[in-house]
Amino acid sequence: YRLVDPDGMVFEAAYDLGILLRNWIDTYRQADPAEELLRRAIWLSEQTAVAKNAIISWGFVEIVSTGIHLAELGYVEEAKDYLQLGEAVATRLTQM
């Protein structure tokens, strides 16, 4: 795989893969959203040979920052989905 940023910016591959974790927000509405996010991060890592922990870290940053940004724009209900997922992931990571 070759990751290409549509804006022509050069970032580490894990950053772009972390954005994918953020974009799957609808799939995390289940009993264990953090487990689903980690499962997807492992899959992305296996497919691309990019470090799993780096993908998870960037995904976490993207999820929380998106939640904060949505809240600032007044989309409080949408923001809750992202911030609750961020909290679930943070809790899971501290247990690992």
Pin down the residues of each PLM region:
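C-terminal/domain-terminus segments
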Residues: 58-90
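Conserved ATP-binding subdomain of kinase catalytic cores across diverse folds
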Residues: 36-54, 59-68
